[in-house]
A protein has these predicted regions:
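Short hydrophobic "helix-edge" motifs at membrane interfaces and signal-peptide entry regions
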Residues: 55-56, 140-142, 170, 176-180
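Residue-level signal for pocket-adjacent positions within structured domains
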Residues: 89, 97, 168-174
């Protein structure tokens, strides 16, 4: 499974949405976010000298990390919109507002969808836990952590009109992995990603 296949999958899913939903949820900006997260997650893993196969997984997981939002946009647009508004008004992570409204977050729905599609388990895990990587059983830095970091950096620096509130990066968690000192370099990598 290659990054190009991830792009084809996301483009296919995004293209099935009705035009009003594309505008309401700023789907073009969401696609751009997913691309930046894939690029940055790969760069983060590369900087930490993870194996080449993990770099590919990071790219694919980053590109697909918000696939569950497509389920929400297409099947539960009003509930999802209310979750976004609730998130903004309460400064509460949007994935938590989704869970309250629908008993599942976009991350969990995305992981389930990718599992149904038969994608590799490291991609499914990264998508499912990209907001809460500490719930995984790993005790060393992983692709899931890279997608978590890349997504939050991009949300912080490039938020769009259909975003909910995003929590800050959990520095204590990064300290437990021994990588908190890398934040400045990851922010520079993000800036370079924007220039591409």
């Amino acid at each position: 499974f290659k990054a190009s296949e991830a792009l084809i999958l996301t483009n296919g899913v995004f293209s099935e949405l009705p035009e009003p939903s594309i505008r309401r949820f700023c789907v073009d900006q969401l696609q751009e976010h997913c691309m930046r997260v894939g690029t940055l997650a790969r760069a983060i893993c590369n900087g930490l000298h993870l194996p080449e196969d993990q770099l590919d997984v990071a790219s694919m997981a980053g590109i697909l990390h918000d696939a569950g939002k497509m389920i929400l946009i297409s099947s539960f647009p009003d509930e999802y919109w209310r979750s976004i508004l609730e998130s903004r008004s309460r400064y509460f992570p949007v994935f938590g507002a989704e869970r309250q409204a629908l008993q599942a977050s976009h991350a969990e729905l995305g992981g389930y969808l990718l599992d149904l599609w038969g994608l590799p388990s490291p991609i499914i895990e990264a998508v499912t836990y990209h907001h809460e990587p500490w719930l995984c059983s790993q005790s060393v830095f992983s692709v899931t952590d890279a997608v978590y970091i890349a997504s939050l950096i991009d949300h912080e620096r490039q938020s769009n009109l259909a975003d909910g509130w995003s929590e800050p990066i959990n520095i204590e968690y990064l300290q437990s992995l021994g990588v908190a000192d890398q934040m400045d370099s990851w922010l520079r990598l993000h800036k370079a990603t924007l220039a591409e």
